[in-house]
C-alpha cells in the first residue's frame, strides 16, 4: 500500500526557511526545465543530472563535460523527471522537513540535506558505476529527512 502523508501533528517552533527555500528552488528549476523545448531540456538534464559513468571516468570526462561530474552530485537533486516526481518529493519535504530543520537548526539542516542528496547519488553510483542514464531528483535527500524524522520523532502521528 502506498503511504501518502497529508500532515503531521508536530508543530514546528520556528519558520522552516531552509525547507521552504529547497522547495522553492526545486519548483523554479522544474518550471524552467519543464518550459524548455524538448531538445534543450534533454541538454539541460544531461548537463546537470548525475551520470554515474561520468564519475567513473572522471579524469577523462572532467575536461570534456559541460559541468564537473562532482558538482552534479548536488545539482541533480534539484532536477525532477515529471510532475508526480516533484510533487511527491516536495510533499514529503514540506510535511517532515520543518520538524527536522527545527530540531537541527537552519545551518545544520542545510548541510544535512545536501549531504543526503550527495549520499543518494553515490549509493546509485555504487549500484551501477558504468550507467550512462541521468539520475535526477531529491529522493536521496528526502530519504535522509524521513529517516531523521523517524529517529527524532518515533511516536509522532
Provide a role label for each language-model segment.
Residues 1-157:
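A detector for small-residue-rich transmembrane helices and their helix-helix packing motifs
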Amino acid at each position: 500500500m502506498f503511504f501518502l502523508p497529508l500532515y503531521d501533528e508536530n508543530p514546528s517552533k520556528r519558520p522552516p526557511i531552509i525547507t521552504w527555500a529547497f522547495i522553492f528552488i526545486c519548483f523554479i528549476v522544474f518550471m524552467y526545465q519543464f518550459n524548455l523545448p524538448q531538445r534543450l531540456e534533454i541538454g539541460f538534464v544531461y548537463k546537470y543530472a548525475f551520470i554515474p559513468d561520468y564519475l567513473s571516468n572522471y579524469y577523462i570526462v572532467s575536461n570534456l563535460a559541460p559541468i564537473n561530474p562532482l558538482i552534479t552530485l548536488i545539482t541533480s537533486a534539484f532536477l525532477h523527471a515529471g510532475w508526480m516526481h516533484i510533487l511527491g518529493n516536495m510533499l514529503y519535504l514540506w510535511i517532515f522537513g520543518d520538524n527536522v530543520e527545527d530540531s537541527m537548526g537552519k545551518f545544520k539542516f542545510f548541510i544535512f540535506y545536501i549531504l543526503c542528496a550527495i549520499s543518494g547519488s553515490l549509493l546509485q553510483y555504487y549500484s551501477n558505476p558504468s550507467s550512462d542514464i541521468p539520475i535526477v531528483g531529491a529522493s536521496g535527500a528526502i530519504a535522509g529527512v524521513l529517516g531523521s524524522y523517524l529517529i527524532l520523532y518515533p511516536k509522532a502521528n
